[in-house]
Amino acid sequence: MSEPIRVLVTGAAGQIAYSLLYSIGNGSVFGKDQPIILVLLDITPMMGVLDGVLMELQDCALPLLQDVIATDKEEIAFKDLDVAVLVGSMPRREGMERKDLLKANVKIFKSQGTALEKYAKKSVKVIVVGNPANTNCLTASKSAPSIPKENFSCLTRLDHNRAKSQIALKLGVTADDVKNVIIWGNHSSTQYPDVNHAKVKLQGKEVGVYEALKDDSWLKGEFITTVQQRGAAVIKARKLSSAMSAAKAIADHIRDIWFGTPEGEFVSMGVISDGNSYGVPDDLLYSFPVVIKNKTWKFVEGLPINDFSREKMDLTAKELTEEKETAFEFLSSA
């Protein structure tokens, strides 16, 4: 057995964490021979609920779980971390301006970034899920200057998986038969789900998605809006936000960081844009296609970008630039 790793999940009393913690504990994220010390952080009013989650994790009798620690204190939660999954954030309440939401979250993610800087290992991998995820991730990274910015990523894998499954449903294949869809930009309704480079396996052969579907108007219209608005559609139907699918996407995202991406496949994640070759301004936390090896991601280079894509990629970059500017105004005063 290897040495145990310390993994933190914040917002640990919430819906997404409830669906995620079992996957982490049973070895399907970090492997079946990797012992784990699982740290659960939430705000003080949630400690009663968190206690129940702690009891359930103990009752799962998972052989890889060496210890489970539930706390409301950052200095305990962030100590010596190998991985931090930042799920907790201030949810948007009815009638709340996006600006107010940003302000509340800048405070949270500045504090958590500072705690990472102070207590965590410098090699820690940080995955931000709490919305607005891209800007929250950038805020945390800026607040932890001695941790490499490449170690910070945010979740756009849920959008990526949604795009894959929409294509699969349309073609009557399984999601596994579809690969190399891309989510560009912000995890918001300006994101751009791009299948210009995606492939689908049909009768044992790999075919481009555009060629396989022969339905450009659907691919440039309804497909994009369905993926962009899927989160809202789930809330409308379920009266709660996506939890099971979000937890599955987080597990996919972390597993790929840990073990690398399969040969010939790339995935989408929000990462720092510095040095990209797609004309996205530097110093944004933007979703790109990446490949991962030895726990290090690299941009997928050299994909041709048509005018339709360019416009959509620029639009979401513009939104992220505005979010960043608003957040940084608050950051200096937070």
Curated annotation (Swiss-Prot):
Main location as per UniProt: cytoplasm
InterPro entries per the UniProt record, alphabetical: L-lactate/malate_DH, Lactate/malate_DH_C, Lactate/malate_DH_N, Lactate_DH/Glyco_Ohase_4_C, Malate_DH_AS, Malate_DH_NAD-dep_euk, Malate_DH_type2, NAD(P)-bd_dom_sf
Post-translational modification, as annotated: ISGylated. Acetylation at Lys-118 dramatically enhances enzymatic activity and promotes adipogenic differentiation.
Residues found modified as N-acetylserine: 2
UniProt keyword terms in alphabetical order: Acetylation, Cytoplasm, Methylation, NAD, Oxidoreductase, Phosphoprotein, Tricarboxylic acid cycle, Ubl conjugation
Enzyme class: oxidoreductase
N6-succinyllysine, modified sites: 110, 214, 298, 318
Residues that bear N6-acetyllysine: 118, 121, 298
A GO molecular function held by the record: L-malate dehydrogenase (NAD+) activity
Binding site for NAD(+): 11-17, 42, 105, 112, 129-131
Entry binding sites for substrate: 92, 98, 131, 162
Active site: 187 (proton acceptor)
Modified residues (Phosphoserine): 217, 241, 309, 332-333
Reaction equations catalysed: (S)-malate + NAD(+) = oxaloacetate + NADH + H(+); (2R)-2-hydroxy-3-(4-hydroxyphenyl)propanoate + NAD(+) = 3-(4-hydroxyphenyl)pyruvate + NADH + H(+); (S)-2-hydroxyglutarate + NAD(+) = 2-oxoglutarate + NADH + H(+)
Highest taxon in the source lineage: Eukaryota
Residues the record lists as Omega-N-methylarginine modifications: 230
GO biological process: gluconeogenesis; glyceraldehyde-3-phosphate biosynthetic process; malate metabolic process; malate-aspartate shuttle; NADP metabolic process; tricarboxylic acid cycle
UniProt record similarity statement: Belongs to the LDH/MDH superfamily. MDH type 2 family.
Xref: PANTHER family: MALATE DEHYDROGENASE (PTHR23382)
Name of this protein: Malate dehydrogenase, cytoplasmic
Biological source species: Mus musculus
